[in-house]
Amino acid sequence: MAQRDYVRRSQPAPSRRKKSTSRKKQRNLPAVSPAMVAIAAAVLVTFIGGLYFITHHKKEESETLQSQKVTGNGLPPKPEERWRYIKELESRQPGVRAPTEPSAGGEVKTPEQLTPEQRQLLEQMQADMRQQPTQLVEVPWNEQTPEQRQQTLQRQRQAQQLAEQQRLAQQSRTTEQSWQQQTRTSQAAPVQAQPRQSKPASSQQPYQDLLQTPAHTTAQSKPQQAAPVARAADAPKPTAEKKDERRWMVQCGSFRGAEQAETVRAQLAFEGFDSKITTNNGWNRVVIGPVKGKENADSTLNRLKMAGHTNCIRLAAGG
């Protein structure tokens, strides 16, 4: 019995046609053209030749540069400028020069060579250097505790007392120096008068021996008379050393309202002055003190004026 291929018969006709057409297309595809191959080979050859030429040309340039460097010995040309310090060294004269200052612009001059204005300025600078440095007053600030504020106020008082003591000591020294100068001048006057009077006594000695004794008595009486003058000059010294022991108050305002007095007191406390408010007959007075001695009160007033409180006045503690 003959076998039949049922599978091939079962496949549809279009699928058979598709397979046959695809095989025909694969057979009909053209091969790579020889012209394209030749162009690609030419491009590749030119690229390789260009690379070779570039590398070879660089080597030649490096060889020429090396030859130029060898011929030049590797040194730059000499500068044409002749430096100024060489001329100064050639024309320098031996000897020690006086120091110069860039601000002055010349040699240091002696006091005889200075102008009157320069001398005045020099004397002023020397006087400023002799003065004692000013001590800055420590001002209590708002964030301080009451104990710290009290400590700062105590330090201020101690500093004021020290400054006052130094000032009084300086005054006493000046008075002593002036007193010593006066005593020296008073002692020198009778010593100069004594030889003047001894000359006529010696001239009269060969003629009148009796007149010799009065001359000595007169010469001796004058130094004795000069002694009371010196004692009389000693008298002003204890009066100058006496101090004002009274107590004074410094008033910086009198207000009807308590708020104004508190603001003034706060300003004084901020600037380092210990003040208080006293009420009398409806008036609120801002006072500082009591301060012992008129000089201390005056110094407090001066410091208040420097701080800007010009309306402060000095009052007696009982007034």
Curated annotation (Swiss-Prot):
Region: Disordered, residue numbers: 1-30, 60-79, 89-113, 140-245
Swiss-Prot/TrEMBL keywords: Cell cycle, Cell division, Cell inner membrane, Cell membrane, Disulfide bond, Membrane, Repeat, Septation, Transmembrane, Transmembrane helix
Region (2 X 4 AA repeats): 197-223
Outcome of swapping residue 283 to D: Severe localization defects
Domain of life according to the entry: Bacteria
Region spans: Mediates interaction with FtsA: 4-6
Membrane protein topology class: Single-pass type II membrane protein
Primary localization: membrane
Compositional bias annotation for Basic residues: 15-27
Composition skew (Polar residues), residue ranges: 172-221
Record field: transmembrane: 34-54
Pfam families to which the protein is assigned, alphabetical: SPOR (PF05036)
Segments of skewed composition (Low complexity): 143-171, 222-238
Topology, Cytoplasmic side: 1-33
An example Gene Ontology CC term for this record: division septum
Signal peptide start and end residues: none
UniProt GO molecular function: peptidoglycan binding
Changes seen on gene knockout: Depletion does not affect localization of FtsZ, FtsA, ZipA, FtsQ, FtsL and FtsI to the division site. Cells containing low levels of FtsN stop dividing while their mean cell length increases. Absence of FtsN is followed by an inverse sequential disassembly of already assembled divisome compounds.
Consequence of substituting residue 83 to L/T: Lack of activity
Quaternary context: Interacts with FtsA via its N-terminal cytoplasmic domain. Interacts with ZapA, FtsQ, FtsW and FtsI.
Family note: Belongs to the FtsN family.
Main function: Essential cell division protein that activates septal peptidoglycan synthesis and constriction of the cell. Acts on both sides of the membrane, via interaction with FtsA in the cytoplasm and interaction with the FtsQBL complex in the periplasm. These interactions may induce a conformational switch in both FtsA and FtsQBL, leading to septal peptidoglycan synthesis by FtsI and associated synthases. Required for full FtsI activity. Required for recruitment of AmiC to the septal ring.
Name of this chain's protein: Cell division protein FtsN
Organism: Escherichia coli (strain K12)
